[in-house]
């Protein structure tokens, strides 16, 4: 599996007063795709995203470039690919499209920290496996 595929219909609450998707909402939708990819590994999201786990994975960088507007009712296709950036961080690249037309590209960089000490920590084995799968 080179890329993880995710689909999301744009809802009215995703849009602004002009009727297009609010700019920051596309990053939120990218995070939904990331969560779905993690869940597809069989990782339980509640513990994965809480301080009760052994590590946390905060986003330390995010960027997005928009190619065209999207509207309520549009079905977005989101492809994501994750890449290791050393032993304690990784990047997720997102390609968003509607009807096979590019909508946006985005990127997030995540850093692995021990949840209690907030010190850098190696990526957990299951996450390393995911990075390997999406890199193939």
From Swiss-Prot:
GO terms for MF: 1,4-dihydroxy-2-naphthoyl-CoA thioesterase activity; fatty acyl-CoA hydrolase activity
Q: Does the keyword Hydrolase apply?
A: yes
Keyword annotations from UniProtKB, A to Z? Hydrolase
> Which GO BP terms, alphabetically?
phylloquinone biosynthetic process
- Pathways per UniProt: Cofactor biosynthesis; phylloquinone biosynthesis; Quinol/quinone metabolism; 1,4-dihydroxy-2-naphthoate biosynthesis; 1,4-dihydroxy-2-naphthoate from chorismate: step 7/7
Query: Catalytic activity, per the record?
Result: 1,4-dihydroxy-2-naphthoyl-CoA + H2O = 1,4-dihydroxy-2-naphthoate + CoA + H(+)
Q: Which PANTHER family match?
A: 4-HYDROXYBENZOYL-COA THIOESTERASE FAMILY MEMBER, ACYL-COA THIOESTER HYDROLASE YBGC
Q: Which family does it belong to?
A: Belongs to the 4-hydroxybenzoyl-CoA thioesterase family. DHNA-CoA hydrolase subfamily.
Function description: Catalyzes the hydrolysis of 1,4-dihydroxy-2-naphthoyl-CoA (DHNA-CoA) to 1,4-dihydroxy-2-naphthoate (DHNA), a reaction involved in phylloquinone (vitamin K1) biosynthesis.
Q: What is the protein named?
A: 1,4-dihydroxy-2-naphthoyl-CoA hydrolase
Per the UniProt record, the source organism is: Synechococcus elongatus (strain ATCC 33912 / PCC 7942 / FACHB-805) (Anacystis nidulans R2)
